[in-house]
Amino acid sequence: MSASSGDYREVAPPGPLAASLVCTWAQTVGARAQRVLPDGCADILWIGEDAPVVVGPATGVTLAALPPGTIIAGARFRPGRIAAWLSLATDELTDRLTPLADLWRDADALTARILAEATPDARRAAIAAALLDRAPQARPPDPLVAAAIGWLARQPRGRVADLPALVGLGERQLRRRFQVAVGYEPKRFARILRLQRLLALAERAPAGRGRLAALALAAGYADQAHMARECTALTGLAPGALLPGAASALALTDFFKTA
């Protein structure tokens, strides 16, 4: 994170939570509003002293602007995993903020436990501990959707049209199960996954002539023009404007850890 965005720290989840969580994280908000890019994940967040919310998977960019000094702490769930922890289909959370109290009866007690901690990292650690306590109540994820997510993550040029045969479901049935688990249909998820792959590759790619064209192909786009259209559609920025600042995005997720 850049200093003007605030101090931001991610911590890998403890072993029993690794299949469900990308990380727990905490941030003290800085002076600059922040672009949060779609990543297919859902978060449970405690923002300042407010009641916690579930932030559903996003279909586009969000501009987050909070008072400087606000403490945010939360847990980021892997694509397709939060539905196992909630009695609600993920597509009912997409592009929404849902009060956690609407979904967990003990949300108030959980909040008292977390907000008793004064520092961002202590709140983050309290969230991890609370989820560890709750883990036995989580249902298993949909195994066929998990297989589809894993295949898309491993195949930069994988075709969504091939998924039904690969997982043994009809197209309509797979689409519905995918929406329930992930929050949107496989094609949209593949687009977001490709964007996140591009961001991850851009962090390591050397500067030089032909960089954008090479990144486009490595990330799974048909060509540089395809990459430009998709970046603009999903983030509001062309690749040349987006990629230099990729490391300052909140939602840089390692999709390739598909436990």
Residue map of PLM features:
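Alpha-helical bundle regulatory/interaction domains
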Residues: 1-162, 166-171, 181-186, 200-222, ...
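A glycine-rich, hydrophobic loop/mini-helix early in the fold
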Residues: 235
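DNA major-groove recognition helix of helix-turn-helix
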Residues: 178, 190, 230-231, 243
